[in-house]
Amino acid sequence: MNSFKSMSLKEKMIYLLTLVYLLPFFIFIAANMLFSMFQTTYMDLYLDTEKPLYKSDHPILLIALVLFLIAGLTYCFKKKEITTEICSAFEKFSLIWAAFISLFIIFLFRVRVACDSAYLSDIAIDFLNGDYSSLTGNGYLVHYPHQLGMIALLEVIYAVFGIENYTVLQFLNVIAIVSTIYYLHRISDEMFHKPQIQILLSLLCIGLLPLYLYTTFIYGDIPSLGLIVPAVYYIVRYLNTQKKIYSIPAIVLMTLSMELKSNSSIILVAAIIILILHMICHKDKFVVLFLLLLIGTPYITNTAVNTCYAHAAKLDHIPSGIPKAAWIAMGLQSNDYIENGWYNSYNWDIYTENNFDTSATTAACIDSIKQSVREFASHPKTCLKFFYKKFISQWNDPGYQAQITIEWYSRHRDDQSDLALYFIYGNGRLILEAIMNFYHFTILLGSSIFAFCSLRKHELANTLLSLCVFGGYFFHLFWEAGGRYGLCYFVLCLPMAAWGFWKLTSRQ
């Protein structure tokens, strides 16, 4: 992008509109980085609820390690000329490593399903047996019908490979993780065209332990991530080339990702905003059709899935489920026992209390939201403390709840190996925690540098990742909190972090 003075009126308008999300993105990511320097969020063992705890960090040590890392990278880049072959070798190694470490984690921990994963698995088995009772009465899917997409996937896997074949589902997670790493490289190459950045990204991908530890997690998170990252790539590719062919995989991948995890709609909203800005800037009329399909295809697909299940269950329609307002109401509620805005069963309870009436539940939730807003307005310090605690509880956990998830799932096995127990309960757990803590700070630092530099100069397509991550930060200020929910956005930070460290290790 040209300097502001030399821009046309239209370019100036687009630049100012992008600052609407680039500036708050920088504030969020920089605050996250500073908080991570001084404090770490973690979860203790043997708990039955998700309860974030906090401990002081070691800022001097973190800074010293980062300076050592920068010095080492600077020396290596000066010493060795970076070629296409070297970039390719690093990328291939990062992909092989991702597959290897993910498979190693599967066979090391050998965990089964628990919590919501167990509910979905049991429902998929019931559906295969012709039992659709979870769609009636006080059933799980009466409350959470948005899980039907994931249940459909479980049904297919169980029908083909056998009931409760968790290993196949975990292998699908491995494929999704490798897809994520591969397309992060494609996004970086499309955005930056710098071989040094590609190598830095490969190195950062090798350290992506929070993602690899989720390989055993049977839920929509990892499969949807393996679809949404390539969707982002094809949207960036379209923005840079205006080749219509790239809209097709973007639409298909976005649709499948949203069917497995409804929160992928945050990425969809970011894509819609970027495409509208692109249309204004380049007078690209095809974007209108692109947007219609990008919005309409997920809706049509979801309707088709719901219709199929309604027909199978002999229902007129699938229950509408808990209204979205319930998650916002819950996300704005104080909670001294767990943490502000975390799950407290409010959404389930209020829907049940109102006899599964969506309108009545929505009205009750809006009253709760108004009450929270009045409390915040009357007590500004309480408001600030509320959102600070909510923010650090979910965004300052270096493992994004990966370790506590493995610990919960491991409780369903009595034959864990000594090595598995070492990493779940022993000193190995602390080692993983320390590695992820440094890695977390490193990614946030690099991303903060990228965010700061983007305020002055940026290409529109290169701001899509920033908008996606900002969307995650903003959405979960008000929505139900949870460390696991931030993993997707943390992964999307990697190309930006690689650019940030390229800036620190080069004189350009």
Which sequence ranges carry the predicted segments?
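Transmembrane-helix signature of polytopic, membrane-embedded enzymes
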Residues: 184-207, 458-465
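Extracytoplasmic catalytic/substrate-binding loops of multi-pass membrane glycan-assembly enzymes
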Residues: 109-125, 129-157, 163-164, 361-365, ...
